[in-house]
Amino acid sequence: DLRMSRGLGDVYKRQIPIHIYADQVNCDKRYIIPLRIAEVSDYEPTPTDTVLMVNLKMVNEYSGTYIISGTNVRYENDEPIVSETSSLNTPRTMIAVDQYTVRLFHKVESEELTNADKAAMKLIVNPTDNTVTIEPWKDLPILKGGGTFDVEKHTFTIWYHYMENGKEYRTEATIVKNKS
């Protein structure tokens, strides 16, 4: 039931479930649905203000704000070079791409849309067994990777190999959803 009532001058905010075909939506674009007030009880609608603009925000079970912590290690001939290890601990926003996919920015890259092509990846969760497949968003040179998603803790555990300046690196990280 989507009926509502409010007093004169009261601000009303309500979430209305709208289901869309996410595979046909670009997560980086803004979509607005105009809704017109057709009728009201007790009052006359103001003729100039009868349209509501609804801004869509794509979310899924995995999207939201997280803290990523882990390590980056340089690899050579499939062996880690322990002396070339750096730590990673930064907040990240996972953007819903579709029902089972989120976009994650690599390392501590700025989460600006202009960086997405070269510095973002997709985490694709298999809902059957909660394994995670890692793929580049566009141009990030990921060689291989994988992981798991813990449904109860809302935590990703991932690893992936990537190339940077002609050298191979491995990231191992735990990504924990921010509860606040």
PLM features per residue range, with description:
Residues 2-4, 8, 12:
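Single conserved hydrophobic/aromatic residue that forms the stacking wall/gate
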Residues 1-3, 17-32, 36-180:
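Intrinsically disordered, low-complexity regulatory regions in eukaryotic proteins
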